[in-house]
Amino acid sequence: MKRIFQTIALIGKPRNPDALQTHKTLFDWLTGKGYDVLVDHRLANDLDVPQDCLCDLLTIGDKANLAIVVGGDGNMLGAARVLSRFDIAVIGVNRGNLGFLTDLDPESFKEELTRVLEGEFVTERRFLLEAEVHRHGQIKSRNAALNEAVLHPDKIAHMIEFEVYIDDNFAFSQRSDGLIIATPTGSTAYSLSGGGPILSPSLNAITLVPMFPHTLSSRPLVVDGDRCIKLLVSPNNGSTLEVSCDGQVSLPVSPGDEVHIYQSPEQLQLIHPKNYNYYGVLRAKLGWSSKLF
C-alpha cells in the first residue's frame, strides 16, 4: 500500500531541551517506521542525525510530502512563508505558548500522528498576504505574511500619518501609531490584542486594525479578501517607518512611499487531526467559558 506521505521533514530551531528532545524522538520514530526524513539544517549543531538528512526550507519544500514544525506559532509562521510556495502539507507539534497553529501535544503526539499518516486528517488552506513597498513607481522591497503586515514607526513609538485606499478608492486618512492588516489566521494574534475581530479561517477577508488612533471614530474594518490595500505614507512623517511581516521580517518605508498589501496567490496547506475543532481551540486558548448544560 502506497503511503500518503513518504518523505517527511522536521522543522524548527528549538529554544529549549524539550523541543530538541521532541525532534530527536520524531526522527527516531519516523525512520524506525521506514519514512525518509529530512531535517531543518538549522538543527545541525543540536541534533545528531546523518549529514545527508540536513537541508534548507526550499529543499524541504521541493522534496518532502509533509513538514512537521516543532515549536510555537512563530516557528510555523517562518516556515509558512517559504513552504506555501510548494505542494507540501504542514502540521505542528506545540512546543511554544498558545499554539493556535500547532495542534499536536508533544507528550502524546505519536497516537494522533499515526492516524494522520494513515490519512485521517482534515486539510485547511490558509492564505497569506503580500506586502510591497513602492518608491517612485518601483517596488523597493517585498515579503509575505501568514498572520499580519503592520505599518509602524521604525525605532521610537510616535504618531504617524498615512492615507488608506481600498482598490484605489480612498477610504480614510489616519494619525495613529500604525495599522495592522491581518488575515483570518492572524486575527487571533496581534490584531486581536489591538481590538480586532476574530475571523473564521475559512473567510476570504482581511482586517484593518488601527493602533492607538488619534480619533475615537477609528475602528477596525473588515474588507473582502480580494481587495488591495494601499497605504500612502505622508511626506510629512519625520522619520523612517517599517512594514513588519509576522513580526519576523521588516521592510523599511520612507516618507512619501506607498505600501501595497494584497492576498498572495500562494496558500499554506495546513493539516489537522480528524477531531480538530477551530472553536474548541479558541475556547481552550482564550479561556472561554465551558458549556452550561
Swiss-Prot record:
Q: Which Pfam families match?
A: NAD_kinase, NAD_kinase_C
Cofactor section: a divalent metal cation
Say where the protein is mainly found.
cytoplasm
InterPro entries with a match to the protein in the record = ATP-NAD_kinase_N, ATP-NAD_kinase_PpnK-typ_C, NAD/diacylglycerol_kinase_sf, NADK
Catalysed reactions, semicolon-separated = NAD(+) + ATP = ADP + NADP(+) + H(+)
- EC number, as in UniProt: 2.7.1.23
Q: Where in the cell is it found?
A: Cytoplasm
Please tell me whether the keyword NADP is annotated for this protein: yes
Q: Top EC class per UniProt?
A: transferase
- Active site positions, chain numbering: 73
Keywords noted in UniProt = ATP-binding, Cytoplasm, Kinase, NAD, NADP, Nucleotide-binding, Transferase
Molecular function via GO:
ATP binding; metal ion binding; NAD binding; NAD+ kinase activity
Record-listed NAD(+) binding positions: 73-74, 147-148, 158, 175, 177, 188-193, 248
Which PANTHER family does the entry mention? NAD KINASE
Summary of the function given for this chain in its UniProt record? Involved in the regulation of the intracellular balance of NAD and NADP, and is a key enzyme in the biosynthesis of NADP. Catalyzes specifically the phosphorylation on 2'-hydroxyl of the adenosine moiety of NAD to yield NADP.
User: Which family does the UniProt entry place this protein in?
Assistant: Belongs to the NAD kinase family.
Listed name of the protein: NAD kinase
Q: What is the lineage of its organism?
A: Bacteria, Pseudomonadati, Pseudomonadota, Gammaproteobacteria, Vibrionales
